[in-house]
Amino acid sequence: MNMKSMKIKTLAVSLLTLGMTACSDSFLDTASKTESNTESFYKTQNDAKRALIGCYDGWRQTSSNPGIGFFVASEVMGAECFAGLGNTDARNYQVIDRFDIAQSSSDLNIYESDWARYYEGIYRCNELIKYEGQIAWDSDAAHKTCMGECHALRAILYFDLVRLFGNVPLLTVATQENVPQSPAADVYQVIFDDLQYAIDNIPADAYPKAKSSENDGRITKYAAEALYARAYLFYTGYYGASIESVTKEKALSYVEDVISSKEYDLVADYKNLWPAASAGIAKVGDAKTLLGTYAGDGNIETVLSMKYTNTQDYNGNNDSNRWQVMVGMRSLTAAPYGKGWGCMTVNPQFVNSYEANDKRKEASIIDIVNEGIAEAEGFEDSYGDWREYTGYCVKKYSPLCFADGTSAVKIDGSGGFQEQNHQDWVIVRYADVLLMAAELGSPKAQEYLDQVRSRAGLASVAATQANILKERKYEFAFEAINYWDLLRQGVDYAAKQIATSGIAVKSGGLDDKVVITEQNIKAKKGLCQIPQNQITLSNNILVQNDGWK
């Protein structure tokens, strides 16, 4: 990695995000009175709040900037979806789906943008932490809350990075050194330390759920506790290792604390968690019908979500859910489902594996034939241009459109379907907290599992580890969770679940097959390709992951 270039670039991005400009008067021995820089900025609590907004924005940029994105990568690598997209598109997503660079041998920098965005976000967090001591805080509570959120954001950014790439450069302070990768254990130590800091410092009542209209999207003590348990389960499962002071008992106590807080609950009807599953067919401007029975952003089940807006454009304003357009049906609208690029076509084997009468199936998956979409105007053109068409698409994050096909990214119909989607990415739900507590050995494991299954319309089953993990598979389908659940059960196990011997699909309207081998997944250990440009810029200090060399 070219750390010097990264530092300069990310500093500039950070200052711009905070509404500041850097000032350099090479011959005047005076400080700027009108502009802010790192020497003059970090002084007041308001400065700290603005810097924290920059940290949140740095996190959001990992989704709002063009790139693969953690969400899409997680789904394409997993067992639920294929890469899809257009029949004549480049095959870079097939490289990801099949863990096979031979699908597109020139695509050596698939994650270039993602790599940069994550380290830019980390840089912003590191800067606020660096200057924490020179800030005049108005209150101890405000100080602890702000810095707790900052540490949690850094933990989230590193948790994504280390899952995607394994050993990564570990930067907790700004540096111009050419830093090599750190062992994953060292990265996880920082992740757990940062989450522990957030748990210890963010007051439980800092962002009450009762005021979600004001607080939605903020990291709470409870979100940090849930993330701690998620990180514990993945680290101990994937690596088969432990870190001193990071224990199963502690992880369980944290998710039990989230439950006992009474801040959260399950939304009564599973489909109402997702806009497309609960939407009505509406005329342009009719928000009430469009939103239908949707429980709303920041609903009682949301523990943590990433927030977006619909103001993104092609002039550098990056604040939308940029990956949502990938989820939409290939250039096809069928109200309430809006169009997109046809990525993440759903594996029919996954569709057929649901238990009978599981309500989550219809809420999660668009069935193109049985919902009458195959008869819609424009379907034949879409079908003829679609790669790895299976007849099934992701419903949970499908874009929306009005009855006439106009994109619903803005209620007045004026928005752009490509760049202005803004559905929240729900990162932690209360259902996840319940199932993690059950998996970690809570005395109430059976009760927690039953709550989740009852909502899905299913009978009770014994709260065994196997049944809990199976439940997660369907509860969290298409939420960027299941791939990591597979990996933490062992790479060999994940490879066996993901591999396909040749599932029949249609590409360009013609017969095709998706072949994913266990060998490819095992060779890569389930990890992603480090961008070759970063390896070159580092003078080969960075080492490519096994299987991608």
Annotate each PLM feature.
Residues 24-91, 196-197, 218-381:
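An aromatic- and glycine-enriched ligand-binding surface/loop that stacks and positions planar moieties
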Residues 162-164, 169, 206, 234-243, ...:
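Short coil/turn linking the two alpha-helices of tandem helical-hairpin repeats
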Residues 90-102, 107, 349-428:
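Flexible, polar/acidic helix-loop-strand segments at domain edges
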Residues 1-21:
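Sec-dependent bacterial lipoprotein signal peptides
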Residues 22-24, 118-119, 190-192, 215-216, ...:
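Long, intrinsically disordered, low-complexity segments
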Residues 44-63, 88-165, 177-189, 195-210, ...:
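Conserved, well-structured interaction surfaces
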